[in-house]
Regions:
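Mixed-charge, low-complexity intrinsically disordered regions
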Residues: 2-25, 29-30, 34-36, 40-43
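A sequence-level detector for short glycine-anchored, His/Arg-bearing signature motifs
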Residues: 224-241
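A short beta-strand motif that forms part of the nucleic acid-binding face
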Residues: 233, 242-244, 253-255
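Accessory, usually C-terminal, subdomains that scaffold auxiliary metal cofactors
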Residues: 250-296
Length: 313
């Protein structure tokens, strides 16, 4: 008895959100998720490697590479960005600032965003530069409450400066390896707050730490007159599709490009981010630049295991 791969038809969410007729569909394997990927900003070799890392079938990779060629050609014709034009303004509403201060006073937020290192601002979505090349269309469409009003960007404050939502995770212990594994669907799950304490002189040392996702804040570092999106991709996309032109966020000043949060290999290069026409956030919703690619759901795993070894005295 042979099994058949179950597939479902997934509508391009960008068309459905815009109220347009979805004339094209791609069969996506059941259990996979549709992402918008800015493949046109990759070189051909890097784009193919990126797609192959997603375990896609060769024929789909070839099809997506053809779409990447169209996107790359389109990018060459786009006008450069104007870094002299202001893309942000201070957020001055007293009630909004009080809510932001309350959230940012949380210990996890103070650790990630120390007081005095950021300001609350409204940044124009059209001029935000993404540093990562993809986002989950289905997840983005699920965010936000019914009280979001595009005519009033302050209605998005609670979404963009959010309380940390409970994150489900699984813990397993490997006693033979003296290891603990923590896994969950949140991609920002990490070790925070590492501490130690010695109970008595020459007594045992007690180590403690927390495993937690990063603060749920839309963060936009500013460097060389450009605004880069460090976190909050799905919320910004949701707001953009609802008609918001500006997003409330925590803006920090970066002295070097690496300070904007460029960690991980699946990010745009410095040459792309500082190009005359870098990626812009609305590109994710563009029918040529934002190429729909199926991704397998990923789990974040944090493994804690002590290294025990001898060193010469």
């Amino acid at each position: 008895m042979t099994s058949k791969t179950e597939t479902i038809h997934v509508v391009d969410k960008r068309r459905s959100y815009a109220g347009e007729n979805a004339s094209s569909r791609r069969a996506i394997p059941a259990g996979w998720r549709a992402h918008s990927v800015l493949l046109g900003y990759f070189g051909a070799d890097n784009a193919r490697r990126f797609l192959q890392d997603k375990a896609l079938k060769p024929e789909l990779v070839n099809e997506l590479m053809q779409q990447r060629e169209f996107a790359h050609t389109r990018i060459q014709s786009l006008p450069p960005v104007d870094t002299k034009k202001s893309s942000s303004r201070p957020l001055e509403d007293a009630n909004a600032l009080a809510e932001i201060s309350r959230v940012m006073a949380r210990p996890d937020c103070q650790g990630a965003y120390p007081e005095g290192t950021w300001t609350a601002e409204l940044v124009e979505i059209a001029n935000i530069i993404p540093i990562q090349p993809y986002l989950d269309l289905d997840y983005a469409g699920s965010l936000g409450d019914s009280d979001l009003a595009p005519s009033d960007p302050l209605t998005a404050v609670k979404l963009c400066f959010a309380e940390k939502h409970p994150t489900e995770f699984h813990v397993s212990v490997e006693e033979s390896q003296k290891a603990i594994n923590i896994s969950g669907i949140n991609p920002s799950l990490e070790v925070v707050g590492l501490r130690y304490e010695q109970q008595q002189n020459d007594g045992p040392v007690v180590l403690s730490f927390m495993v937690s996702p990063a603060p749920n804040i839309v963060s936009v570092p500013r460097y060389a007159g450009r605004h880069f999106l460090a976190s909050g991709y799905h919320r910004v996309y949701r707001l953009m599709k609802l008609g918001f032109t500006h997003v409330p966020c925590a803006v920090s000043e970066a002295k070097t490009l690496p300070q904007i949060g460029m960690r991980g290999r699946a990010l745009f290069s410095e040459a792309v981010l500082m190009a005359p026409r870098p990626p812009r956030f609305p590109d994710f919703a563009d029918m040529v630049l934002g190429i729909v690619v199926p991704f397998k759901p990923m789990h974040r795993v944090v493994r804690i295991r002590p290294d025990e070894y001898f060193v010469s005295g």
